[in-house]
């Protein structure tokens, strides 16, 4: 009976969240065709699936959700359940289906994430949120993608013919969940690195995507969660990024839980790790992304 309890708790939470938010639209990032696409199958076409707050619950912020999966898949429990939780708190959530290895390599993934931020910004009026309150959350390899979006962005391309490309790709905040960060260190995740960069990537490319080396004073603030028991993506990834944020003077909040395996998602059934969503909500209020 005992092993059923976490599953039951997750089911009950999912029912509650679903009553407060529903999936609505699927947005193709490049309606005219994805640059660099190898075909027209679903895996070749990055999209955003929209989860809106219930009527009267919109708090005027948005978040892009990047599931993990080692850059070779997209974990279901880091997908819809995450978006529904954020929507239940008043954020408009957009789940990013980004391109994956080994069919695709860098920069396809960050191109998708940057385009996602721009696209969400272009939808601010339609969905009723502030274009300066757009965050990104990523889990594991999705955390690497989110941290890449937060350190490899641009202000927009003024001469672009596509109006979306004229918008900034900088997220206003990051939520990094047991993230892959330090590609150029012994703490990196070899599977994510291989799917992202191939077997023998140039050293300079690896270093440029070891995102603790890319933090500046202009990097957006971050909320970071990891566990000391994570043997898949070592906690040093979160520690190195937090140290870089501190050195750059960028607001950052780290929650390092003693217990917990890799890939817990919302953490339903884990009495400690399951506290992170509430802590994140408090942080979003303190940072002014949600009303207090």
Predicted regions, residues:
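Primarily recognizes the serine-hydrolase "nucleophile elbow" in alpha/beta-hydrolase
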Residues: 115-188, 206-207, 211
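N-terminal cap/lid segment of alpha/beta-hydrolase-fold proteins
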Residues: 23-57
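C-terminal catalytic histidine-bearing segment of alpha/beta-hydrolase fold enzymes
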Residues: 40, 51, 225, 235-292
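Active-site glycine-rich loops that stabilize anionic/oxyanionic intermediates
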Residues: 67-72, 228
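Short beta-strand/loop motif that positions the catalytic acidic residue
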Residues: 224-226, 230
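Short beta-strand element of the alpha/beta-hydrolase
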Residues: 59-68
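Active-site nucleophile elbow and catalytic-triad environment of alpha/beta-hydrolase enzymes
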Residues: 46, 160-164, 199-214, 219-220
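Catalytic nucleophile-loop/oxyanion-hole region of alpha/beta-hydrolase
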Residues: 74-76, 81-82, 96-131, 270-275
């Amino acid at each position: 009976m005992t092993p059923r309890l976490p599953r039951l708790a997750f089911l009950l939470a999912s029912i509650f969240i679903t009553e407060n938010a529903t999936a609505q639209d699927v947005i193709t990032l490049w309606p005219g065709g994805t640059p660099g696409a190898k075909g027209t199958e679903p895996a070749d076409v990055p999209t955003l699936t929209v989860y809106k707050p219930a009527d009267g619950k919109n708090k005027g912020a948005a978040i892009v959700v990047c599931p993990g999966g080692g850059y070779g898949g997209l974990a279901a429990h880091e997908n819809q359940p995450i978006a529904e939780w954020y929507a239940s708190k008043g954020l408009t959530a957009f789940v990013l289906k980004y391109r994956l290895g080994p069919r695709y390599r860098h920069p396809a993934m960050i191109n998708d994430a940057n385009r996602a931020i721009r696209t969400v910004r272009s939808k601010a009026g339609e969905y009723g949120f502030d274009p300066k309150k757009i965050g990104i959350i990523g889990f594991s390899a999705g955390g690497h993608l989110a941290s890449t979006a937060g350190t490899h962005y641009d202000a927009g391309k003024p001469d672009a013919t596509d109006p979306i490309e004229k918008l900034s790709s900088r997220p206003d905040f990051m939520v990094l969940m047991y993230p892959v960060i330090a590609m150029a260190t012994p703490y990196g995740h070899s599977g994510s690195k291989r799917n992202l960069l191939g077997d023998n990537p140039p050293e300079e490319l690896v270093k440029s995507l070891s995102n603790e080396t890319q933090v500046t004073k202009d990097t957006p603030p971050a909320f970071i969660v990891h566990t000391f028991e994570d043997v898949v993506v070592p906690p040093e990834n979160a520690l190195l990024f937090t140290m870089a944020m501190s050195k750059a003077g960028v607001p950052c909040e780290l929650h390092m839980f003693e217990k917990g395996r890799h890939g817990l998602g919302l953490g339903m059934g884990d009495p400690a790790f399951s506290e992170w969503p509430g802590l994140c909500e408090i942080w979003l209020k303190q940072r002014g992304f949600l009303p207090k």
